[in-house]
Amino acid sequence: MTLADLRTQADELDRNDSLAHLRDRFCIPRHTDGADVAYLCGNSLGLAPTAARECVEQELVAWEQLGVEGHFKHERPWVSFHELFAKHLAEIVGAKPYEVVAMNTLTVNLHLMLTSFYRPTHERFKVLVGHAAFPSDRYALASQIELRGHNPEEAILTAKPLAASRVLRTEDVVALIEQHASELALVLMDGVNYYTGERIDIAAITEAAHRHGIVAGFDLAHAAGNVPLALHDWNADFAVWCHYKYLNGGPGCVAGCFVHERHGFAREPRARMAGWWGHDKHSRFKMGPDFEPIPGAEGWQLSNPPLFSLAALLPSLELFAEAGMDRLRAKSEALTGFLELAIRGLFPEWGEVITPAEPARRGCQLSIRVTRDAKRAFVALVANGVICDWREPDVIRLAPVPLYNRFADIVRCVEVLSCAK
């Protein structure tokens, strides 16, 4: 394969892309040369939908014109504004609308879920996590363990790849569950790992955990909006995710949470950290002293959600509904496969792709461990308008996103690498 061959293939693929028009619905940053950048960083922060500004401004105008009455007299009343998101989020994560809610931020939601679902006993107090869990997850988990009077060093069990592999296999996680079942209170895994890009089998891990009465929860920060999910059918107990990566809600925007209906509608409500926005909607404003949770995931809400953050998220979710996860996933597999083909074919000595090669075991991201002059290659990419990110000590992450990336973006990335290697 040559660069010329790659350009020809990319041109053909872009011409035949049935989702190409969606790119025009996003604000693409410009490079210093005036051209669009090749933005391969949607795994860190998604781009702004062109409609986001107008959607936020509509709510600003409503605030200016209505004041507090916007909660009830607005065309989209603020008191129920978050309910607009349930159907969209349910489709994206594979849930019932009442099993999902947009609220808080990811780590806050994780704390709320751990408060309700991590119920250690003297015998079963350990938590199984993945080898490269995002640090905030480990911080939250360790603090929850300490609050229960246990030692995190003893209570956290880490699933690590086999010596010959850099990624974690689902079967290895299942084997650890079987081995430590009598000690485990919770399995907490990433749907897609932020560092390696590896994807685990949520259904298989949940089934293995439930065989032994172990709770199964998931961090979907790098999975929601990236890969198809079926949380309800897979019987996951809970899940949390952010909306600022693949779901394009803006930096630090409101996050998402899933609670399976068997918990959200249990006859005896699960213990939780409670707040007034999770109280029964029909009696919330009676300001009674006793908490009555809304059935479903909404019952874990604390305060009324940040309205402007929600407004910025809505246009992206509408684009997901328009495109459909199946079509987006098909394009995603094609983009990432094209990127991998180019990297392996043109630069076999440049670096090691540590993300699994099988499409079913990854999302859109490729993580490349660069074997020499890694930082120089990264600096060259960014300097030439290829926006990606760096993870210590030597990994470059590239994530072509089907909503707004073209195959031509991958060609630009490869062209820069050909000059920098």
Where is each model-derived feature located?
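Pyridoxal 5′-phosphate
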Residues: 1-421
